[in-house]
């Protein structure tokens, strides 16, 4: 339990730093749409789909190593990189500014693009192993 907790913490720290870097890098691109969080969630969904397929298909790892990889990268890094709470706060901020249609569009694009990304990531990796 202690090692898994450490792996989640390390992965989460790096994921949060990567999210911060991406949101800072994209802040000047759009003042209305929270592009950084949108990209984090879409990229994270793509990667989690790829990781799911990789861990299912590859025989490189035994079950114990797969658990360590999953806790470090999926639960830790991607948990720190993607964020539902920031997404929700961004929506609240848009609504408070009266930008209802932008908020609705942001919700739709975020959910649909993230879902498409996780499916795409999964099947890209599954295709490699078939």
Swiss-Prot record:
It comes from the Bacteria. GO terms for molecular function: fluoride channel activity; metal ion binding. Pfam families: CRCB. The keyword Isomerase does not apply. GO terms for cellular component: plasma membrane. InterPro entries: FluC. It is found in: Cell inner membrane. Na(+) is not transported, but it plays an essential structural role and its presence is essential for fluoride channel function. This is Fluoride-specific ion channel FluC. It comes from Francisella tularensis subsp. mediasiatica (strain FSC147). The lineage of its organism: Bacteria, Pseudomonadati, Pseudomonadota, Gammaproteobacteria, Thiotrichales. The gene is fluC.
């Amino acid at each position: 339990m202690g090692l898994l907790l450490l792996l989640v913490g390390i992965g989460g720290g790096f994921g949060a730093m990567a999210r911060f870097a991406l949101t800072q890098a994209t802040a000047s691109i759009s003042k209305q749409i929270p592009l950084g969080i949108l990209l984090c969630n879409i990229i994270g969904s793509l990667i989690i789909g790829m990781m799911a397929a990789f861990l299912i298909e590859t025989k490189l790892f035994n079950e114990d190593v797969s658990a360590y990889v999953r806790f470090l990268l999926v639960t830790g890094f991607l948990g720190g990189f993607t964020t539902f709470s920031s997404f929700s706060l961004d929506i609240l901020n848009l609504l408070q500014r009266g930008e209802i249609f932008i908020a609705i569009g942001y919700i739709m694009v975020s959910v649909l693009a993230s879902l498409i990304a996780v499916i795409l990531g999964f099947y890209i990796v599954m295709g490699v192993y078939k």
